[in-house]
């Protein structure tokens, strides 16, 4: 197959190279299925992808950030920065027209004259599966072996720079007097002159490459047989994988090995039982008892509509009740590989020999102690659900409720005294509980012969609670994270409202003083400033009133709706997503214009919502 996608950027004047978005991809796949004998089958697959991606460079000069250029152009640019292109030359207004003479940002600064990237991806996939039936031993028994190999190579070519000479437009009198002449002067000349600024620079070139190889091997014994109303199946599986060139310790392959056992039972396809157990090992843990973990699970289901007492009713087409419990493990929580071993020694200051003529020698120290007891983070999960269908299966409904108890979370110990001479390793001591639910409704129907449509809606809720994180108790309970959700803002004041003129007393000299009955901040405040809560009740708002406040950065509620239709091969879909109970904080660069790196502009809704003497009642921001 072949895929080509083109971008939306136009060819801009003066730019002698193509930096538009372009995507070319060739993919291929070949499969061979063969019966080697009457009881032996083989499946061989070969596939791959050859791709090339081109995109404009989006690094903003002076910020060190690499962001989506369209987001940057909308949020950071100044609407009065310039008129665009005049006579084929990018035109800006003088930087003296913005506060502090900062850099002007127009909507093209993120990609015009910045260069472009080209990324070449090559992927090869091979897989082989051989199955041998063993019905001569017992019907339904078989053994299989499977092997897979993936090879990936990426080459990135970076062409940076390529700046293009621009021009700055001035009023003639402004340019002649260096801005000292007042525009109200009757002799002020407002004719426009264009002064070249900047210069053409060549593109610079660099390239980098990356690669990856993955091996996977699997052997399994399968059993699947039906005895009248009873169906029984079983699986015993061994697998191992090796990943070459991982991100950490690149030249040491990452290895996994595991055993899986599974048994299922069904009676008349209405009573269902599934039991699983996994025994997995990870190289991230020390050899011995901590390297391997046992992860059992089981589930049960009942399809009530398969019962005889449900045969004559015409309301419910399908009803299934289900419940499950399982334990899963995670070895990705480690901050680096091989945490059970001490980190490498490195230079750490120096020490001296002698008194009169001391000789200084470099000192070496271990950067991190090893933790031979580091092991799997585990989570015990429960799930209870119900599936329903009505009106000839046109209306469907699903409800799930889950409970999770997570232990062994790898965290940095907080209660250890600071007099310890080296950094302690992370420990498997964290505990978090989680619970929530998900509800979904769907309607699918057909009008006439060719028109089908669907409407689906869903809502989910999830909230966790920190049970233990080795937190040192703070002076006030509202400062502690334990007992609340993960991901909340720490060390913040609780916002109440904005100060108004009615909160102040005007002195004889016109100076505003906050009314004494209000809590007194440790800094002087004025109308329009944010009022924060006095949590400890000492009538002073200071560092003792900082708390763990608000919701986490991830939403507790997520709402979704999908709608679509299909008519004679033409289909249309749309998706709506919403969230609730979530807090995000904008960085200062997005709240105060012309600050910090990038000299960014201010979002309009921030400006419109700021407190001013004319906008006291409608203000939502200081």
Each language-model region and where it sits:
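Transmembrane beta-barrel wall of Gram-negative outer-membrane proteins
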Residues: 1-55
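Histidine- and/or cysteine-centered catalytic micro-motif in compact active-site loops
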Residues: 3, 402, 460, 575-579
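Extracellular/periplasmic, surface-exposed regions of secreted and cell-surface proteins
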Residues: 31-40, 46-50, 59, 72-76, ...
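Conserved small-residue
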Residues: 58, 63, 337, 444-553, ...
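Glycine-rich, aromatic-lined ligand/substrate-binding cores of catalytic
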Residues: 139, 552-585
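Short Gly/aromatic-enriched secondary-structure transition segments
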Residues: 160-161, 255, 472-473, 577-580, ...
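Catalytic-site beta-strand/loop segments enriched in glycine and acidic/polar residues
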Residues: 234-242, 272-281, 531-554
């Amino acid at each position: 197959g072949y895929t080509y996608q083109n971008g939306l950027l136009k060819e801009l004047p003066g730019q002698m190279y193509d930096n538009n978005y372009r995507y070319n991809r060739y993919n291929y796949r070949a499969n061979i299925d063969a019966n080697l004998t009457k009881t032996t089958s083989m499946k061989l697959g070969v596939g791959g992808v050859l791709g090339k991606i081109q995109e404009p460079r989006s690094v903003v000069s002076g910020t060190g950030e690499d962001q989506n250029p369209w987001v940057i152009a909308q949020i950071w640019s100044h609407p009065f920065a310039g008129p665009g292109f005049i006579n084929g030359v990018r035109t800006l207004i003088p930087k003296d027209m913005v506060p502090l003479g900062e850099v002007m940002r127009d909507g093209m600064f993120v990609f015009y004259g910045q260069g472009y990237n080209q990324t070449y991806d090559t992927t090869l996939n091979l897989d082989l599966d051989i199955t041998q039936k063993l019905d001569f031993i017992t019907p339904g028994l078989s053994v299989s072996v499977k092997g897979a190999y993936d090879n990936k190579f990426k080459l990135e070519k970076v062409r940076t720079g390529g700046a293009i000479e621009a021009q700055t437009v001035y009023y003639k009198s402004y340019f002649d007097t260096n801005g000292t002449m007042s525009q109200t002067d009757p002799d002020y000349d407002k004719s426009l002159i264009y002064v070249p600024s900047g210069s053409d620079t060549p593109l610079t070139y660099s390239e980098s490459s990356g690669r990856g190889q993955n091996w996977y091997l699997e052997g399994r014994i399968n059993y699947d047989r039906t005895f009248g109303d009873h169906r029984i199946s079983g699986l015993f599986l061994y697998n191992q994988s090796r990943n070459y060139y991982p991100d950490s310790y690149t030249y040491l392959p990452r290895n996994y090995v595991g055993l899986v056992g599974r048994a299922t039972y069904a009676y008349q396809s209405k009573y269902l039982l599934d039991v699983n157990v996994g025994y997995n090992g990870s190289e991230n843990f020390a050899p011995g008892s901590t390297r391997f973990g046992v992860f059992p699970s089981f589930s049960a289901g009942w399809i009530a509509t398969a019962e005889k007492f449900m045969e004559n009713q015409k309301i419910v087409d399908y009803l299934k009740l289900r419940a499950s419990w399982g334990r899963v493990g995670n070895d990705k929580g480690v901050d680096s590989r091989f945490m059970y071993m001490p980190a490498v020694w490195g230079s750490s200051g120096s020490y001296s020999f002698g008194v009169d003529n001391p000789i200084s020698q470099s000192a070496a120290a271990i950067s991190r102690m090893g933790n031979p007891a580091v092991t799997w983070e585990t989570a015990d999960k429960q799930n209870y659900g119900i599936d329903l269908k009505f009106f000839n299966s046109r209306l469907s409904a699903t409800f799930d409720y889950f409970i999770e108890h997570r232990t062994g979370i790898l965290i940095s110990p907080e209660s250890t005294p600071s007099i310890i001479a080296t950094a302690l390793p992370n420990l498997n001591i964290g505990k978090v509980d989680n619970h929530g639910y998900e509800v979904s409704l769907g309607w699918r129907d057909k009008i006439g012969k060719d028109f089908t449509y669907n409407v689906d809606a869903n809502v989910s809720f999830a909230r966790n609670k920190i049970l233990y994180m080795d937190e040192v108790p703070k002076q006030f309970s509202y400062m502690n994270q334990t007992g609340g959700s993960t991901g909340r803002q720490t060390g913040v004041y609780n916002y109440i409202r904005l100060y108004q003129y009615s909160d102040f007393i005007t002195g004889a000299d016109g100076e505003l003083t906050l009314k004494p009955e209000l809590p007194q901040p440790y800094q002087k405040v004025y109308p329009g400033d944010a009022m924060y809560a006095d949590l400890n009740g000492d009538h002073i708002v200071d560092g003792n009133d900082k708390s763990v406040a608000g919701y986490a950065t991830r939403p507790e509620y997520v709402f979704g709706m999908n709608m679509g239709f299909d008519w004679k091969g033409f289909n249309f879909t749309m998706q709506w997503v919403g969230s609730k109970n979530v807090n995000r904080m904008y960085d200062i660069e997005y709240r105060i214009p012309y600050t910090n790196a990038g000299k960014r502009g201010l979002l309009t809704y921030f400006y419109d919502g700021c407190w001013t003497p004319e906008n006291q009642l409608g203000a939502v921001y200081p």
